[in-house]
């Protein structure tokens, strides 16, 4: 049954994406950029609904009140495709940093281009970071919310923190609050895996880190607060009845936490 539900959801996800891009295209490209935001937000919400109905995984997102009313940086953990869509309905005017190659995909790339995201060449990290800072500063004047994954790539729940320098430089240069986001969605929607596991996927927007800290103080605070919240969510998920399979990184981290608290 789990395989069938996973298969049904994976097929529905792609079909839903393609169909919505085609159906909404005439209206989406005619509307002004901000007015057109309801289309990707509706798509993201519909994907979460399909995930709930077909795979049995319900999203429960808290702490949205911590989002500043003006420009900010949102820094979620990156474990799954789930965290690229789940927060979109909650963010007023999201701004993503993405690989420039995604802009070359027919139709999808046009959708992204309309929202004026930040495409970068990941082959040159220093150049990509300078470009992200330059364009990010321009977009901040439009009261947008920049989403960046501090660890860069997807990592399994419980893995050792591996935060990159990019988030630090953006914090220092853009001088806006940073809102960490904790979750363990990788338990339910694992990276590079076919199976989708049922349960409640809890995510939490944490209180913002205001600008003004030194680079090192900011990084240590970001890691400390994000990882502490992720640890709590991991323990909560592991204690839940019929919890999803725990990857080795999650098992090892839970054992560490138990020792520390004993």
Describe each model-derived feature in a short phrase:
Residues 3, 130-262:
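Non-catalytic C-terminal accessory region of glycerolipid acyltransferases
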Residues 4-29:
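A hydrophobic membrane-anchoring feature enriched in long, contiguous, low-charge segments
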Residues 61, 74, 96-97, 203-205:
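Generic preference for hydrophobic
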Residues 55-61:
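Membrane-helix interfacial anchor on the cytosolic side
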Residues 21-41, 45, 52-54, 69-125:
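Catalytic core of membrane glycerolipid acyltransferases/transacylases, capturing the structured
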Residues 61, 118-121, 211:
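Short acidic-hydrophobic, aromatic-tinged amphipathic segments that line or gate anion-handling sites
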Residues 63-67:
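Glycine-rich helix-loop-beta junction characteristic of Rossmann-like nucleotide cofactor-binding loops
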